[in-house]
Regions:
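A secondary-structure boundary/capping signal
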Residues: 2-3, 43-44, 125
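Mid/C-terminal beta-alpha module of Rossmann-like enzyme folds, strongest
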Residues: 96-179
Length: 179
């Protein structure tokens, strides 16, 4: 796996981490050229999902943990947009790749453009959301026991995936509540 930071564009320009990811990609592409081996290079956006380590490298994990445990969260800019890949969607893509059916793409800056002969691979389902949208959803989830209002959570939606993630951080005493 690689990272969107390998683009070395925008906020990633000049990043040593991004440079190392790009060099790693090139090593795999060279190996494929020399040996004919199939190589699947993925540039993952921000990953999130159940039981991810909070206060490490995932704002979603930190926010879910903190809201579920009545800890403060800090959002410097509610309009900051993240591209997120849910861990279950990543696993589905990895299984497709293992079966010889990765989703091939090329990149238009940071956006995958899916095409049969693409140099890269990408999970077809990601979600672009703002920090403010994430926090607002988490606050609705937290209020559910008090309001008894189940938020609208369509199957396959970002809200459904975030709700599943949030529930994984709830202490067991908060999972049960009176009706």
């Amino acid at each position: 796996s690689s990272s969107i930071q390998a683009t070395l564009l925008g906020r990633y320009a000049g990043s040593d981490y991004g440079k190392s990811k790009l060099a790693g990609e090139e090593l795999f592409f060279d190996y494929a050229k020399q040996t004919g081996a199939a190589v699947y290079v993925y540039r993952f956006p921000n990953l999130f999902g159940k039981w991810c380590r909070p206060n490490y490298n995932s704002a979603v994990a930190t926010f879910c943990n903190n809201v579920a445990n009545d800890l403060p969260i800090t959002v410097n800019d509610r309009a900051t947009e993240l591209e997120l890949l849910y861990i279950d969607d990543l696993v589905e893509e990895m299984l497709d790749a293992l079966e010889g059916h990765p989703h091939r793409c090329n990149y238009d800056v940071l956006t995958p453009v899916f095409c049969a002969g693409g140099r890269y691979c990408a999970a077809p389902v990601t979600h672009k959301v703002t920090l403010g949208e994430i926090v607002d959803l988490l606050e609705k989830f937290k209020a559910q026991p008090a309001t008894l209002v189940v938020p609208e959570i369509p199957a396959g939606s970002f809200a459904k995936k975030l709700y599943s993630t949030y529930l994984s951080y709830l202490p067991k005493e908060k999972v049960i509540f009176d009706l």
